[in-house]
């Protein structure tokens, strides 16, 4: 199993190209199931989750061709995927595929909308009522689907097609919004989604669907209106830049000091996080190339932050901010309001010397001057990259184990950081 070896203490200086957003690329790839024509997606990151979704779509009979420059080539801007779902041969998504990535459950929406049936495994470890799957099922039932759960599978059917309806979510859900949005595009009549998620990735998917012939308005607001159409066609769409990757590298620069241009980053996608970084002492300068992040000389200021749905501070940057605050000049407070059990990185940060106290959903971080390198274990995607950020500023060597989590969401992470002066390398098993 691969590991990441880091020798801390180096400042970061240079340019980091920001990849396409994984959280947009995945639903965009799934949306290709809505049409018999080819959907072309540009700026798709090369990630383990993208590769896994390609396998899942292939299981349904979808043809996918990848083109474009390889990482490391001059002017690399992600891969281009040509996705053709002209002949969907299987409407079953089996457990052995879905269990490896929760977002793969979303294939239920386009399969049901276009083929009028779907049989999709519940994601691994997913209990109805405690994960957002119950909200996804609620949305499909509102649109007229008949749903049964048998043998760990959600079996959905709509023999006469889906019907437009009002889908009112009891709480904001990104997954539920994606599923309702895709399913409603081919439903008869009008669908109104209320309490919809407002994330930029929702807007990106809606923009692509409209290019395919859908009639979606209001994406990016809590109320989305979809006028159903009879069919969707092919289109070409460029995946928006990854705001979580942008925020992660910005926090890495704030942690180590230095100055880095995050090329292709768009500040409006993560303004709340940039405001927190400014409060923490980083210099944030948007320009026509992206966002320049610097911290030269000044220390790191403590902050108090609560995660929130967009446009608030993203839960997917919570672990990275916590790593940064371990070296702040004072006490910081971070409250997690989106997900339960999202402080698994605390124990591993403590191995590097961090002083963190948990009280329910709030972490209190007492900043210290120096972290110490140590072997650590990645527990999930965002936790793993927080350990990398901490290791970049730690004294001595940090070895991050189980880095397959990183490969799910960060394209060429060690190469991007190494190019800016970090002492970081992948040790292959």
Swiss-Prot record:
Phosphoenolpyruvate binds at residues 22-23. Pfam families: EPSP_synthase. It catalyses: phosphoenolpyruvate + UDP-N-acetyl-alpha-D-glucosamine = UDP-N-acetyl-3-O-(1-carboxyvinyl)-alpha-D-glucosamine + phosphate. Its main location: cytoplasm. Pathway: Cell wall biogenesis; peptidoglycan biosynthesis. Keywords: Cell cycle, Cell division, Cell shape, Cell wall biogenesis/degradation, Cytoplasm, Peptidoglycan synthesis, Pyruvate, Transferase. The modification 2-(S-cysteinyl)pyruvic acid O-phosphothioketal is found at residue 126. It is found in: Cytoplasm. GO terms for cellular component: cytoplasm. Its EC number is 2.5.1.7. Cell wall formation. Adds enolpyruvyl to UDP-N-acetylglucosamine. Belongs to the EPSP synthase family. MurA subfamily. This is UDP-N-acetylglucosamine 1-carboxyvinyltransferase. The gene is murA.
